[in-house]
């Protein structure tokens, strides 16, 4: 018997949802659900928001000249920004784990969109 992947178990899904919501409503106070990784979720969400300009500059430095971050889908922007935050500011987390977890979270959002 294999374990089913549940987005509720992936703190990155919550991170993406919080940052995406924040994109559309900057005035709303952020609240965080009870979760065993609540501290991690808060840290990534708040850190990504606080370091938004640094993260955007870092991303822009690595994009092709014909590609701009602001032209990309908003969910994709949030996923990339939060992953870059973890790469830069969470050195204890393996790069492999960060990539794997954000790929899983991305699949959740892609599959959710395709069923709409």
Predicted segment positions?
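N-terminal interaction/assembly modules
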Residues: 1-116
């Amino acid at each position: 018997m294999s374990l089913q992947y549940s987005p509720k178990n992936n703190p990155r899904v919550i991170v993406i949802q919080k940052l995406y919501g924040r994109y559309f409503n900057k005035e709303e106070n952020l609240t965080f659900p009870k979760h065993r990784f609540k501290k991690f979720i808060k840290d990534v969400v708040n850190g990504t928001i606080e370091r938004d300009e640094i993260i955007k500059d870092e991303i822009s430095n690595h994009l092709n000249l014909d590609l701009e971050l602001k032209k990309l889908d908003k969910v994709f922007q949030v996923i990339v920004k939060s992953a870059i935050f973890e790469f830069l500011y969470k050195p204890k987390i393996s790069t492999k784990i960060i990539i794997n977890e954000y790929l899983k979270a991305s699949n959740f959002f892609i599959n959710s969109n395709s069923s709409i």
